[in-house]
């Protein structure tokens, strides 16, 4: 299975990288140092890369975004359309992948760290949170049948912190499972009340938080529920990269056609995957699968 195989392969590779404290992974001129990565949660899977972005990269992204900030919106769970909501009170803008060499370099760095294709990612969204602004707990995978058509679910999310925040502004996972023998990496006194409601990551300029919205079998992970705590003192700048299961750049074909969306569908169907993994292969009326033709579902 392409989707399931991609996820499982990634986690296998990533676990090896986390065990290495000295090796560097490179792609062309892009280097990733596993020793700077620490796991902050296992359920959901979440990791922080300390110093992922340089000071220059952070300041450059903020500079690009300042001129085109607009109030942030959320996706309606039924229609999939964007709407304004008090759930999300930040302002933001999208930076195209090939905007300039610095942005392209960040895109390369993300792909090298995650082992995920650049074409699966959306453009980077830069956000500004001023005093009192926040993003209530939400999921990054989709509940509507519109957004999922292009690239499938958002498999992974990377939050890159572009500024330090004096107080507040943490990213919190309120439903994350907290190990009974957890060693606290943060002094609870340094966290806001919002952040104390679960496992939280304090925004530090240059750091990046990577977490997965799906389980390795491509099923949505409800423990990936997360939110951005209100900024109490200072200002918060961040950049979000959503990475989908499949290509986000690929042109979506018109609906109504009985086609397979993966060249391996016919082989998988012969191997019995239509019944073993019906969510991916067949799907539902609202969220059609990727191999409906080979599974004789249309």
Curated annotation (Swiss-Prot):
Binding-site positions, Fe cation: 138, 140, 226
Residues linked to a glycan: 77, 164, 257, 262
Domain (Fe2OG dioxygenase): residue spans on this chain: 120-245
Lumenal topological intervals: 26-298
Parts of the chain that traverse the membrane: 7-25
Gene: P4H4
Cystine residue pairs: 258-298, 265-291, 274-295
Cofactor note: Binds 1 Fe(2+) ion per subunit.
Name of the featured protein: Probable prolyl 4-hydroxylase 4
Record flagged with keyword Endoplasmic reticulum: yes
Annotated binding of 2-oxoglutarate, by residue: 236
Any one of the GO CC terms: Golgi cis cisterna
Domain of life: Eukaryota
Chief location: endoplasmic reticulum
A molecular-function term among this protein's GO annotations: procollagen-proline 4-dioxygenase activity
Location within or outside the cell: Endoplasmic reticulum membrane
Species for this entry: Arabidopsis thaliana (Mouse-ear cress)
Membrane topology (UniProt): Single-pass type II membrane protein
Catalytic activity: L-prolyl-[collagen] + 2-oxoglutarate + O2 = trans-4-hydroxy-L-prolyl-[collagen] + succinate + CO2
């Amino acid at each position: 299975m392409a989707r399931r195989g991609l996820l499982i392969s990634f986690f296998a590779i990533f676990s090896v990288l986390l065990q290495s404290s000295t090796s560097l992974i490179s792609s062309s001129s892009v280097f990733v140092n596993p020793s700077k990565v620490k796991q902050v949660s296992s359920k959901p899977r979440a990791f922080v890369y300390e110093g992922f972005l340089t000071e220059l990269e952070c300041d450059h992204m903020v500079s690009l975004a300042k001129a085109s900030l607009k109030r942030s919106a959320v996706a309606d769970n039924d229609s999939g359309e964007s709407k304004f909501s008090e759930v999300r009170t930040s302002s933001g803008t999208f930076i195209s992948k090939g905007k300039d060499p610095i942005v392209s370099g960040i895109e390369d760095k993300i792909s090298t760290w995650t082992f995920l294709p650049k074409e699966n990612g959306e453009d980077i969204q830069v956000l500004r949170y001023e005093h009192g602004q926040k993003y209530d707990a939400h999921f990054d995978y989709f509940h509507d049948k519109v957004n999922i058509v292009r690239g499938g679910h958002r498999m992974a999310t990377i939050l890159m912190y572009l500024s330090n925040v004096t107080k507040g502004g943490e990213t919190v996972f309120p439903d994350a499972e907290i190990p009974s023998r957890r060693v606290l990496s943060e002094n609870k006194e340094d966290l806001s009340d919002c952040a104390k409601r679960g496992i939280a990551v304090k925004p530090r300029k240059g750091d990046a938080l990577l977490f997965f919205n799906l389980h390795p079998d491509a099923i949505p992970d409800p423990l990936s529920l997360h939110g951005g705590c209100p900024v109490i003192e200072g200002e918060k700048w961040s950049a979000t990269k959503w990475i989908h299961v499949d290509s986000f750049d690929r042109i979506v074909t018109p609906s109504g056609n009985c086609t397979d969306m993966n060249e391996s569908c016919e082989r998988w169907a012969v191997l019995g995957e239509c019944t073993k993994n019906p969510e991916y292969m067949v799907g539902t009326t609202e969220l059609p699968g990727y191999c409906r033709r080979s599974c004789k579902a249309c």
